[in-house]
Amino acid sequence: MKALFLIFHGFEEANGISKKIRYQVKALKECGMDVHTCYLNEENGHKCRMIDNHTLRDYGSGIKGKLRKRFELQSIVKYILQENIQLVYMRSYHNANPFTISMVKQLKRQGVKVVMEIPTYPYDQEYITRRMKLDLLVDRCF
């Protein structure tokens, strides 16, 4: 079975979440799945959506790059359908918004199974800045 492990951020080698994701991908592969990883790469303010180590979509830099990385998800849908991906495993990262919901609906209409991992720890108290609280508010709305 072909699967896509979809995350909405990049990898940091010293980060525990990044290590967990890499172990999850490894475990899925050991179970016989053909797993590809979709993630964001941001170097020097330049943003790209990656599949494994290949650029799926170059969003550029600046405000346009920041907006595109959040709202442009059609490249992911196109890749999934072209590659006949049967399962998408998404890791939630404050990305509950109309664009993500629309992407999931499109995939489900095409028969793609979608699983979303949602962190269960009480993270609300960890958000102290206005920007963090805004992310949390949007996440709660959708």
List where the protein language model places each region.
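Hydrophobic/aromatic beta-strand patches that form the interior of the parallel beta-sheet core
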Residues: 36-38, 57, 115
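Membrane-proximal helix-turn-helix segments that form the acceptor-binding/catalytic region
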Residues: 26, 74, 98, 102-110, ...
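Short N-terminal targeting/anchoring amphipathic segment
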Residues: 77-98, 112-115
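N-terminal subdomain of nucleotide-sugar transferases
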Residues: 1-44, 82-83, 110
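Histidine-centered beta-alpha loop that forms part of the nucleotide-sugar donor binding/catalytic region
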Residues: 8, 92-93, 117-122
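A short, charged, and often flexible helix/loop element on the N-terminal side
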Residues: 44-78, 90-92, 129-134
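Residue-level recognition of beta-strand->loop/alpha-helix junctions
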Residues: 39-41, 60, 122
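Short aromatic-enriched loop/helix-cap "lid" or pocket-rim segments at secondary-structure transitions
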Residues: 16-18, 47-51, 100-102, 126-130
